[in-house]
Each structure stands twice: as structure tokens, then as C-alpha cells.
Amino acid sequence: MPSACSQFADLGQPILLLRYRSFFRQTGHAMNESITQIKDITAKPAPLGLLGFGMTTVLLNLHNAGFYELNSMVLAMGICYGGAAQIVAGIMEWRKGNTFATTAFVSYGLFWLSLVALIVLAKLDWGAASDEKAMAAYLAMWGLFTAVMFIGTLRLNRALQVVFGSLTILFFLLAIGDFTGASAGFKHATGYEGIFCGFSAIYAGLAQVLNEVFGKIVLPLGLVKK
């Protein structure tokens, strides 16, 4: 039976180490120990999570920028790709022992589901609609969370720094807009910032896909020297 389990990174691929112990009773106790290495060859879930976040963010912020009204397309993306896909990616990252990615993808997946719930619950009269100050507090809390997560990206790559940095700005701009009752022009400008944020996540996700497929850097991520 395995008595210990740990993961190590080997060229970006975790290796699962299972330690087996066998005991023999003679005049005393002797222990034989062997280690079996199992290389993790499962696919990288990060591109799925980044694309789910990025595409949904672009579509929502096209609404914020004034291109169309909020509609079922945005809500469906929030439930399925922005919500469910990110949660799946986060669970897969948990299996790989990636605390940062697990926290990010599961949290933002649940953010999208909670945002849809805020809209739908009010429409169904299952609760009072959130006023602007409540929404400002909601968005500011997510902005604070994202700002702290941004610090973590300083050890990762430039592409993720852009994603989390622009997302932090987006959350606080949205919070300010709701708290102050900002003009339509301010909210439209915030929408354009959100479109940029979404496309930066799409870039980061597709870069990982193409770089792996071609076995070389097709789209640079700007790796940080540790």
C-alpha cells in the first residue's frame, strides 16, 4: 500500500512519486523501500480556463461598451463557458497540484455563475434586486481578490500579469461606476477596458495551445526569470 505521495515538476510535467514500504519480521524489524515514478501526461487545463474566462469577458464587455443590450447569449456564456468550463479547469489543475490555477479558475468560474444568479434571481422575483451600492461592494471585493492574485503572477509570466492587472482595473472601474452612478460614457470606456482584458486572456490561452502543438514558441508568453 502507498504510504506517501508527492508531486515534482519535470520540464513542466508533474511526476507522481508513490512510496511503497514492506516489512519483514525476523529477529528485529527491517524495511525495504522502493519508489515508482508515474509521469503526468494529462493535458494542460489552463488554456480551457483562460479561454472560458476571456471569451465570456469580451462578450459581456461588448454589452458594457454599448454594442448591444444584455441578453440570453451573455447569460448562457456565463453559465457554460465562463462558469462551468473554468470550474472544470480548476478541478483539473487541483489534480496537478497547482494551487494558484485551482484558486483562480474555480473562483472566477463561480464568479460568473454568481453574476448570472444575481440577474436571474431578480428577474424571477426570488429576491430583491441588488442596488448600485451592493453591486459596487460585490465588484470591489472581486477587485481586491484579483489584486492579490496579480501579485502571484509576478512569479509566472507577463501574459498573465496583463490579464490579472487589467482585470483588477476592470473590477474597480465597474465598482466605481456603480457606487458613483457614473455617466454612460464612463461605463462605455470601462467596457472597452474589459474587452482588452478578455482578449489578453484569449491570447494567453491560445498561446499555450499553439506553443504546445508546434513544440516551439509561436506566441510568446514572456516567461519570468525566477
What are these language model-derived features?
Residues 31-89, 93:
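N-terminal topogenic module of multi-pass integral membrane proteins
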Residues 70-82, 129-141, 164, 191-195:
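Structural signature of hydrophobic alpha-helical transmembrane segments
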Residues 102, 106, 110-137:
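Helix-adjacent hinge/juxtasegments
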Residues 137-148, 158-179, 186-207:
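Alpha-helical membrane segments in multi-pass integral membrane proteins
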